């Protein structure tokens, strides 16, 4: 899970990409919700914002504007 705009968002489905990067862990590195983590990248596929239904990434991004380079916590 991560927090964004004071809301908890659960990651329900994701893919780990074993790829080198220079970003701080937690940094959003693309507009498709790819998150830098440790020594790879987490590509989020499905998530659920608190008190809302589960959405695939395309549905979520239609209603939520998270900017690239945002550091998620």
UniProtKB/Swiss-Prot annotation:
Record-linked InterPro entries: Formyl_trans_C (IPR005793), Formyl_trans_C_sf (IPR037022), Formyl_transferase-like_C_sf (IPR011034), Met-tRNA-FMT_C (IPR044135)
CDD domains, sorted: Met_tRNA_FMT_C
Sorted UniProt keywords: Protein biosynthesis, Transferase
Family annotation (Pfam families): Formyl_trans_C (PF02911)
Coiled coil: none
EC number: 2.1.2.9
Transmembrane segments: none
Annotated function: Attaches a formyl group to the free amino group of methionyl-tRNA(fMet). The formyl group appears to play a dual role in the initiator identity of N-formylmethionyl-tRNA by promoting its recognition by IF2 and preventing the misappropriation of this tRNA by the elongation apparatus.
Family statement drawn from the similarity comment of this UniProt entry: Belongs to the Fmt family.
Protein name, UniProt field: Methionyl-tRNA formyltransferase
Species the sequence originates in: Rickettsia montanensis
Gene: fmt
């Amino acid at each position: 899970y991560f927090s964004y705009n004071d809301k908890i968002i659960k990651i329900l489905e994701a893919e780990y990409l074993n790829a080198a990067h220079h970003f701080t862990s937690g940094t959003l590195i693309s507009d498709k919700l790819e998150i830098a983590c440790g020594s790879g990248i987490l590509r989020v596929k499905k998530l659920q914002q608190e008190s809302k239904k589960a959405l695939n990434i395309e549905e979520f991004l239609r209603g939520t504007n998270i900017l690239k380079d945002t550091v998620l916590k």
